[in-house]
Regions:
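Conserved class I S-adenosyl-L-methionine
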Residues: 180-181, 208-224
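S-adenosyl-L-methionine
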Residues: 2-91, 99-108
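Class I S-adenosyl-L-methionine
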Residues: 220, 224-273
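A short acidic, Gly/Pro-enriched loop at the edge of an enzyme's catalytic core
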Residues: 151-167
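Conserved beta-strand signature within the Rossmann-like core of class I S-adenosyl-L-methionine
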Residues: 201-209
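SAM cofactor-binding core of SAM-dependent methyltransferases
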Residues: 85-150
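A short SAM/SAH-binding and catalytic strip from SAM-dependent methyltransferases
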Residues: 166-185
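A short glycine-rich, Lys/Arg-flanked "PGG" loop and its adjoining helix->strand segment in the class I
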Residues: 187-201
């Protein structure tokens, strides 16, 4: 899997040795609000019928995911044979209603997607699409992605170089427009460093936003992290440090509406050194 792009958007140091035991503290300020929303009958049916197979219960232990994914050190026999350990593994943080997630998973059937979302209708909507499209490469944890990362996903370890995440997707996180709420933005230095520590060397963090001040903050924070490098600054200097939109990320209905109103969209793709 790579982050090569086709459509432009608007304008190694030693690895961090963070382990879940060192990250047991969770941020006091959450970056999301649990929205109230009605789960439709179709979404509820998808949860009942497909949830037992595709939803992984939150368990604050690295062994819980390792037992499912050989990419994280689990036995290959539990995940479809030895070839499963060679499949790319992507963490998606906050998938909304799952439109982009389902599109990308369908486009990349040989890649596994571990997707976190706290909004119940969104979980139901993605499960519904999994059933309709016959997808098999998505698993969902209906829990705060930061707690999942801190307690269930180990940092990359040079002693097991093939284990770890190949990519992390963070598309359109809440921009928290008001200045007094900026501290709630998800993309902050400490979190980015912990995300980067879980990528394999060469893996990448792909962020997208339609709020320019947040795009500028992302570019600064990602650029300051010693584990990450911005290859787009060299390959597409005309974009000012942003990346062309990778071909795999679709235009969602929300994004199309924004573009129709003249709003910009900024992609950022930073690779692990």
């Amino acid at each position: 899997m790579n982050a090569d792009a086709m459509h432009p958007a608007p304008s190694s140091p030693d690895p961090a040795k963070h382990g879940p035991s060192q990250e047991s503290h969770h941020r006091a300020i959450r970056s999301f609000v649990r929205r109230t929303g009605r789960t439709t009958a179709g979404q509820a049916r998808a949860v009942d019928e497909l949830g037992p197979r595709f939803v992984i219960p939150f368990q604050p232990s690295v062994s819980a995911l390792a037992a499912i994914y050989p990419q994280l050190g689990g036995p290959a026999s539990l995940s479809g044979g030895s070839q499963a350990a060679q499949r790319a593994l992507v963490l998606e943080i906050g998938f909304g209603m799952g439109e982009a997630t389902a599109h990308i998973a369908r486009l990349m059937p040989e890649t596994d997607f571990l997707c976190c979302e706290v909004h119940p209708p969104g979980v139901g909507a993605l499960l519904k699409q999994i059933g309709e499209l016959g997808l098999h490469n998505i698993r969902i944890i209906a829990h705060d992605a930061v707690e999942v990362m801190d307690t269930m996903l180990p940092a990359w370890d040079a002693s097991a170089p093939t284990r770890g995440l190949d990519a992390i997707h963070l598309f359109f996180p809440d921009p928290w427009h008001k200045k007094r709420h900026n501290k709630r933005r998800l993309v902050q230095g400490p979190l980015v460093n912990r995300l980067a520590a879980r990528l394999k060397p060469g893996g990448f963090l792909h962020c997208a936003t339609d709020w320019q001040p947040y795009a500028e903050q992302m570019r600064q924070v990602l650029g300051d992290d010693p584990l990450l490098e911005n290859r787009s600054a060299l390959t597409a200097p005309e974009l000012g440090g942003y990346a062309p939109k990778p071909h795999y990320r679709p235009l969602t209905k929300f994004e199309r509406r924004g573009l129709g109103l003249g709003h910009g969209v900024w992609d950022l793709v930073f690779h692990r050194r």
